[in-house]
Amino acid sequence: MSSRTSTSSYKRMFGAERQAMVRSTYSSRQYSSPGRTTSRVSYSSASSTSPSLYMSKSARSATRLATETLDFGLADAINTEFKANRTNEKAEMQHVNDRFASYIEEVRFLEQQNKILTAELEQMRGKGSSRVGDLYEDEMRELRRQVDQLINEKASVEVDRDNLGENIERLRQKLQEEMLQREDAENSLRSFRQDVDNASLARLDLERKVESLQEEIAFLKKLHDEELAELQMQIQERHVQIDMEVAKPDLTAALRDVRQQYETLASRNLQESEEWYKSKFADLSEAATRNSEAVRLAKHEANDYRRQLQSLTCDLEALRGTNGSLERQMREMEDNFSIEASGYQDTIVRLEDDIRNTKDEMARHLREYQNLLNVKMALDIEIATYRNLLEGEEYRITTPFPNLSSLSLRESMKEIRPAMDSLSKKVVIKTIETRDGHIINQSTQKDNLE
């Protein structure tokens, strides 16, 4: 009764009885290469006819043999040995059932863990990688946009710098021309100053000559006056003598003629001296006026050149200041651009590290999942093996045995061994190729081993 109850409960738990016992082995190998991982999973199973059939056949033959040749004197000893064997088998079955229950609990726990890890892996595949990839792409687009903007700004600043450089070069050339013109004006001014100095010296010389001539005229006039005075005195003395001497000739007309001649000569000399002085003074005045006008024009041009030079110097200083400020701004922009580019590069490296870490984490989860799957498959194989063993044992236990001799049991075991030796073996080789944590190829190969 207990045997039937255990059989029905086993059928409710594991299904109908199997008439074939499966012996399976499992092995897994992984070959890794850069960027590619190959997993090779091998299954070997052996199927044969259940030993219970051989046992039933041997039991039938033993029954016929026992009915024909059984010695009733040994029945009690055989029954006692059979009861002891049944007790030992029950204890072993209880131990096997306990181990089987623990294996079932462990398998359930591992299946739950496998489901959790599978859900996490699917979530990471569905959301994590896409979210990180989208963030990476958005960040890269933003960085590229900023880099393009900075490149455009740098190009515009370089164009402005080139334009300012051209303006500075043009102003420098203009400054050189103005400086040459200033040097020419200064040379002209120096020549004009030399002419003015020469004219001044000539004027001073003429003034001295005029003074000397005036002094000479004054001296001659004084001398003339003195001579006239002497002549008048002589004339008076002679007039007195003439008055006293009646017979002396009349000298008045001669003196008058001499006086007129001297007066005419003196007036002519004075007039010529005045005309010569006036002409010389006019020439000197005209030369001085002309030279003063040239000096005034030269001074005016020099002042104009000085003002232009000052304005150009101010413009040059302003342009130098503008150029210096633009160069400082350009250096600051280049420094900021270098700093931002290095920051963007660090961000890119950090994002690549995050992506690499995420891929490594996914690969690690895949490896764990693969390991758990391997463990699950090994446990499934072991459970199937235990199930087949339990089915065989339960079938053997529930089969009614009459009182048998030890000879019949030995013969039945001898019949089972050849049957076990004649098992056919099948090897299943499953190859899985992964790259960056994703399965890219999967193949299965079956081989039969004798």
Curated annotation (Swiss-Prot):
Residues 89-397 form the IF rod domain. GO terms for biological process: intermediate filament organization. Residues 394-450 are annotated as: Tail. GO terms for molecular function: structural constituent of cytoskeleton. Residues 1-81 are annotated as: Head. Vimentins are class-III intermediate filaments found in various non-epithelial cells, especially mesenchymal cells. Vimentin is attached to the nucleus, endoplasmic reticulum, and mitochondria, either laterally or terminally. SMART domains: Filament (SM01391). The lineage of its organism: Eukaryota, Metazoa, Chordata, Craniata, Vertebrata. It comes from Carassius auratus. Expressed in low amounts in retina, optic nerve, brain, and spinal cord and in very high amounts in eye lens. SUPFAM superfamilies: Intermediate filament protein, coiled coil region. Residues 82-117 are annotated as: Coil 1A. This is Vimentin beta.
